[in-house]
Design a protein with these regions (language model features):
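Amphipathic, heptad-repeat alpha-helical coiled-coil/stalk segments that mediate oligomerization
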Residues: 1-151
Length: 151
C-alpha cells in the first residue's frame, strides 16, 4: 500500500512542481491545529486578514488500485452481479477516502473549507467523475474536489 501511495505522491509532486513555484505550495504540511497528520501537499493561498497569513488548500493523492482492478476484472468477465458489487465497492472506497481527507486535513480558517483528492491514473479518475451523483456527494458532504493527471 505504501508503494501505491508513494507513486501517487511522487506524480502529484511532479505536477505541482511543473505548475507552481516552490513558494506556492508545501509538502508534508500539518494543516490542523493539535493534529498529528500531515497532508502530502498544500497549496498556499493568501489569508483574509493579513497578506502574511497563509491559508492552505490540502491536496492528497489516493490510489484505490485493488478495488478498481476488481471492477475492471468484473467487466472483462461480463458478470453483471460482480460488476454491480465491485462498482458499489469502488464508490464506498472513494467515499471513505474523501471522508478521510476531510477529517484529517480540512480546518478553516487555517485551510480552505475544501480539499483536493488527486487520483494518479486517468482511467480511475474518468471512472469516478462519470458518476455524477458520487462527485456531487463528495463535494456536498465532504467538500472534496476530485482531480486527475490532466486536470
Amino acid at each position: 500500500m505504501k508503494t501505491r501511495g508513494t507513486f501517487g505522491e511522487v506524480q502529484l509532486g511532479a505536477l505541482l512542481d511543473q505548475m507552481l513555484s516552490p513558494e506556492q505550495y508545501e509538502a508534508n504540511v500539518k494543516t490542523k491545529k493539535n493534529a498529528t497528520e500531515f497532508v502530502e501537499f498544500a497549496i498556499k493561498l493568501p489569508g483574509k486578514e493579513n497578506n502574511n497569513d497563509t491559508v492552505y488548500l490540502p491536496v492528497d493523492a489516493k490510489f484505490p488500485k485493488d478495488v478498481y482492478e476488481q471492477y475492471q476484472d468484473a467487466y472483462e468477465a461480463g458478470d453483471a452481479a460482480l460488476i454491480e458489487t465491485s462498482s458499489r465497492q469502488l464508490e464506498i472506497t472513494i467515499k471513505k477516502m474523501a471522508k478521510d481527507i476531510h477529517d484529517k486535513y480540512v480546518d478553516p480558517p487555517f485551510t480552505t473549507d475544501f480539499a483536493i483528492m488527486f487520483l494518479p491514473f486517468e482511467n480511475i479518475y474518468a471512472e469516478v467523475i462519470r458518476r455524477t451523483a458520487l462527485v456531487e456527494m463528495l463535494q456536498k458532504d465532504w467538500k472534496i474536489v476530485v482531480t486527475g493527471p490532466t486536470t
